[in-house]
């Protein structure tokens, strides 16, 4: 408390609150402490700092501001563990002891301040400042990544134009998928046709292990040829049906793209410049120039 001088409390008031609290801690000759882990000491420092702000706000001289801080610190220590009745008695005694340090107006203001803050919340002060609290605190340091730098607005695309481009791209992708499906079906039918013909002709051995077949009769040969033709026609019919349906689907997709192109949003308007060049090109400026030239000829 010896370091707490009128000039010191003046500096405390002039600082911002974080710097002012730390300066007050040094003036009180307190050791540096962890604000998070030592909540009791932090609350006590807040209480003393608030007393400085109160006294200055009420117009106390700087000498009396020092006495207000001293009064508050002594009151907190002397009422530790006391009942509220005892605390009121101690408050009255201390006000009598300090009545020579303040005039009547300031003494009454200090009495009201102590009653409205300390006595009104006395149980809370006792709970925080008198009883040991079990602190279970975990401090985690998280890395925060800043969002990426956005592109310039001039490089952006109008919302309606972007939506139109997305719809056209989806239709183009669907058309490509339809064509790819036709090619895949052709390859699948070709493999199925080969397997069915192989099964119809009874060719199950590997090419290097083919055995001579007995001579076929005319009826058997006609049956095999007829079955082969039937297999080819069935595969070709399925392929044609799918190609026809795919062609209709592709035409429908192209029609949708054409409709979209006709209803495309208008391009964004160019930036309108208001420089001298723009003014010279305007109709009014051209008319004015013509008028000046006509007058000059006259």
From Swiss-Prot:
* Region Disordered, annotated ranges: 264-298
Task: Say which domain of life the source belongs to.
Answer: Eukaryota
Q: Which residue ranges have biased composition labelled Basic residues? A: 287-298
PANTHER family, alphabetically? COILED-COIL DOMAIN-CONTAINING PROTEIN 189, SIMILAR TO 4930578I06RIK PROTEIN
Q: Under what name is this protein listed?
A: Uncharacterized protein C8orf74 homolog
Its taxonomic path starts at: Eukaryota, Metazoa, Chordata, Craniata, Vertebrata
